[in-house]
């Protein structure tokens, strides 16, 4: 019997537990004390970390491997990537590679590596003092300021002019090392690829919808994006070049890019499970359980035949609400009854306090939809937007 080690599970990683069981594997998990109780009865063994930093995730993963050698290892989210990469490398089991894990975890390392590889990406500067980067930034306005290792748009903001740059430099003076980039115009997409021994088994392009500047919070995703075959082929070639530069071996890749008149321009890459229910969207779109596919790769199992194309079209809607105290919630049950809605939920209720939206953490719920064609999906998505309302004061 094989053993699958999950470094981090959370809520959205629970399908990995089911996937391991479906494949007949024992499942061992490393999780924080805060979330351990919710999964304790679902795994064969549980290692509780002493915190949620990269270092303490690694400590937990090292302890798990010392007690029992797994046959496969999966990192759930961003803070677990380095821990999983190190034990995958140590054990010689399938994984992205330690190099890919390190690059994935640091956006400044990505910029340096991809500049050397000739990958199209924004002009950039790594700074310890934003104010000291003023001359460079003012020559390239608008610019984007972002931290090196956060996810979910946290700390990302567009700076449109000189006055705004001075304000941001003062406000973020004690934040430490930051990345400053020339802003790139063009619609946002992501490229999800399952990779085995450096070769792409299958890839999908997802269209993103964001709030735009200054924080670019993602509010909707549409898998099997409506782009031409030529554009898709160009994106696949671009993705393959990025994988080669990253040193990617085996596992899941989530690559974010903007599509410009000159072609794709890289925003960032991550070698872990994408958020915003993209795995569920991929399953709905192509008729395969992507959590099980990732587990198969991790355990060295055979994969089924790759999909020939979408069997339906899927989207996620991740609503925001005006900052304040929630006074009423309308339409949730009606949304759940819609024939195109697969799942719908809200994370707020009456009297909840909603902070001003600066990152994905301030979104108030999720709706997953699937339909037989794009027009039906868009009509359903529009109806959900009209129906689901969170009122605040």
Identify the meaning behind each predicted range.
Residues 1-4:
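Extreme N-terminal starter segment of soluble prokaryotic enzymes
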Residues 13, 116, 133, 295-393:
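Peripheral (often C-terminal) accessory segments that flank ATP-dependent C-N-forming ligase machineries
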Residues 105-185, 196-199, 221, 225-237, ...:
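Active-site nucleotide/adenylate-binding loops and adjacent lid/helix of ATP-dependent enzymes
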Residues 182-248, 252, 259, 266, ...:
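ATP-dependent carboxylate/phosphate-activation module, predominantly the ATP-grasp catalytic core
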Residues 64-70, 137-140, 173-175, 246:
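Glycine-rich phosphate-binding loop signature in dinucleotide/nucleotide-binding domains
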Residues 6-15:
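Glycine-rich adenosine-cofactor-binding loop
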Residues 30-37:
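Short, polar loop motifs at secondary-structure junctions
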Residues 41-126, 363, 376:
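Conserved N-proximal alpha/beta basic substrate-recognition cap immediately N-terminal to
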């Amino acid at each position: 019997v094989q053993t699958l080690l999950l470094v981090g599970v959370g809520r959205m990683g629970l399908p990995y537990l089911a996937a391991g069981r479906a494949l007949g594997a024992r499942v061992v998990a490393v999780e924080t004390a805060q979330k351990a109780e919710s999964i304790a009865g679902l795994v064969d063994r549980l290692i509780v970390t002493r915190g949620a930093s990269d270092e303490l995730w690694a400590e937990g993963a090292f302890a798990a491997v010392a007690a029992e050698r797994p046959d496969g290892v999966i990192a759930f989210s961003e803070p677990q990537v380095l821990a999983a990469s190190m034990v995958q490398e140590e054990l010689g089991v399938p994984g992205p590679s330690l190099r890919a894990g390190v690059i994935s975890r640091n956006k400044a390392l990505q910029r340096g590596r991809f500049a050397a590889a000739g990958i199209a990406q924004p002009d950039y500067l790594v700074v310890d003092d934003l104010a000291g980067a003023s001359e460079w930034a003012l020559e390239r306005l608008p610019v984007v300021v972002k931290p090196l290792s956060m996810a979910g748009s946290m700390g990302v903001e567009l700076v449109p002019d000189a006055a705004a740059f001075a304000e941001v430099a003062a406000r973020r003076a004690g934040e430490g090392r930051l990345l400053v980039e020339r802003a790139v115009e063009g619609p946002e997409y992501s490229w999800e690829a399952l990779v085995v021994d450096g070769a792409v088994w299958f890839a999908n392009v997802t269209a993103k919808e964001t709030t735009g500047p200054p924080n670019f919070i993602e509010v909707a995703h549409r898998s099997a994006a409506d782009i031409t075959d030529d554009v898709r082929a160009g994106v696949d070639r671009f993705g393959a070049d990025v994988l080669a530069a990253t040193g990617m071996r085996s596992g899941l890749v989530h690559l974010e890019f903007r599509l410009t008149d000159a072609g794709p321009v890289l925003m960032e890459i991550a070698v872990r499970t994408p958020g915003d229910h993209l795995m569920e969207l991929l399953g709905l779109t192509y008729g395969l359980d992507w959590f099980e596919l990732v587990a198969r790769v991790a355990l060295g199992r055979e994969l089924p035949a790759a999909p020939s194309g979408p069997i339906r079209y899927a989207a996620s809607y991740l609503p925001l609400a005006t900052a304040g105290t929630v006074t009423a919630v309308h339409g949730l049950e009606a949304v759940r009854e819609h024939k195109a809605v697969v799942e719908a939920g809200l994370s707020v209720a009456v009297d909840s306090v909603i902070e001003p939206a600066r990152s994905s953490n301030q979104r108030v719920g999720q709706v997953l939809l699937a339909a037989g064609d794009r027009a039906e999906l868009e009509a359903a998505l529009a109806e959900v937007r009209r129906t689901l309302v969170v009122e605040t004061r």
